[in-house]
């Protein structure tokens, strides 16, 4: 019997750790982990700036998606003192086949978390911050009010910091989206993750067209907020399916599209069906730009929050250019 979900995993094998973090995947047959191609290589973290970022995160008892999702860009981002904070705990109520975040029954919300996040943003001197969360289907509003509290706390502590939220879908949470939008983040990101044909096997707890409508509704509520969405490729999707997804996002007036390579966290997760080449990513970016997105980022190591601050500046410039200013 595997240890309980809150037990220490330091002495466990990789397979045992996976069972602790992902008990809902224990029944899945092991999937082979393919060798990464030469174009997917990152430097190991360990710079003084990386260590300082890690220290601030730990001192404030914060959770980052950089760590929980096993992001390959953590060394680069933390060296620049960039971190994506994951609020409302480290335990998700869903069990997506691609995701390395722990699944289970989450704890209650920490009322001090907004202040802790705001203090960390101030100490890191962030000009742009990304706030994401686990899915909290157990909460009546899906955690929307907590998102709003975090946004307001950052605004008070660090008024010049621009704020990007990467939210869950708030499925069956009436009024939740409106609460987050009313707090006026600068960027509202919600990832589609994959094409609709793959939802049942990759993202079974979500609904593709609900996510499209969520993004469209943000623009209806506040057209000044930039909207953003991201997908992974290499999950078995076809090129035509990706192009149709681009059209769906443009119909919802989404400003920014990110496309990155799916990387398999453990043998219990969805297998990598293909490694997309840099040239294929460049071709996707060319098509997406032609379809009218303000900004497109497509590469093997592209992730939703990678270079988010620089991308926000580019988004603002692209909007002004399109408006002829």
Swiss-Prot record:
Pfam families: Radical_SAM. CDD domains: Radical_SAM (cd01335). It is found in: Cytoplasm. Residues 1-32 are annotated as: Disordered. Binds 2 [4Fe-4S] clusters per subunit. One cluster is coordinated with 3 cysteines and an exchangeable S-adenosyl-L-methionine. GO terms for molecular function: 4 iron, 4 sulfur cluster binding; lipoate synthase activity; metal ion binding. Pathway: Protein modification; protein lipoylation via endogenous pathway; protein N(6)-(lipoyl)lysine from octanoyl-[acyl-carrier-protein]: step 2/2. Its main location: cytoplasm. Residues 78-294 form the Radical SAM core domain. The keyword Protein biosynthesis does not apply. It catalyses: [[Fe-S] cluster scaffold protein carrying a second [4Fe-4S](2+) cluster] + N(6)-octanoyl-L-lysyl-[protein] + 2 oxidized [2Fe-2S]-[ferredoxin] + 2 S-adenosyl-L-methionine + 4 H(+) = [[Fe-S] cluster scaffold protein] + N(6)-[(R)-dihydrolipoyl]-L-lysyl-[protein] + 4 Fe(3+) + 2 hydrogen sulfide + 2 5'-deoxyadenosine + 2 L-methionine + 2 reduced [2Fe-2S]-[ferredoxin]. Gene3D superfamilies: Aldolase class I. Its EC number is 2.8.1.8. InterPro entries: Aldolase_TIM, Elp3/MiaA/NifB-like_rSAM, Lipoyl_synth, rSAM. Residues 19-32 have a biased composition (Basic and acidic residues). Its cofactor is [4Fe-4S] cluster. Belongs to the radical SAM superfamily. Lipoyl synthase family. HAMAP family: Lipoyl_synth. This is Lipoyl synthase. The gene is lipA.
